[in-house]
């Protein structure tokens, strides 16, 4: 049986993001949210970190039902050229039972 996968991430927008119109930015973000929903994934936490670090604007946690959903979501990020607009870091993990 597959178990949930958690993606811990940090990010910041790159200059190309600010070259997009507000409508284009909103369209990309909407497609990301739709992809999460379609895969049964969700953002469980999204934090503004801009005030505490000069490297990242946000950090958060996404929960995916399985590793296949993570892989499909990453494919969506590539299709949307997310790496052109965002610099980030992420790590995947599973829940540690204590």
Question: Can you say where each PLM-predicted feature lies in the sequence?
Answer:
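Conserved short beta-strand edge segments in small beta-sheet-based binding/regulatory domains
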Residues: 82-94
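Short, surface-exposed basic-aromatic patches at helix termini and helix-loop junctions that form
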Residues: 75-82
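Short S/T/G/P-rich N-terminal loop/turn motif that feeds into the first structured element of a domain
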Residues: 1-57, 65-71, 75, 93-98
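Conserved, mostly hydrophobic/aromatic
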Residues: 60
């Amino acid at each position: 049986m597959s178990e949930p996968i958690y993606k811990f991430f940090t990010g910041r927008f790159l200059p190309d993001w600010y070259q997009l119109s507000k409508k284009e930015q909103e369209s990309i973000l909407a497609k990301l949210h739709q992809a999460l929903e379609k895969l049964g994934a969700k953002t469980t936490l999204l934090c503004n970190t801009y005030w505490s670090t000069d490297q990242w604007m946000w950090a958060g946690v996404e929960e995916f039902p399985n590793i296949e959903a993570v892989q499909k979501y990453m494919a969506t990020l590539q299709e949307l050229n997310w790496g052109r607009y965002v610099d980030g870091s992420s790590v995947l993990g599973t829940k540690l039972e204590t």
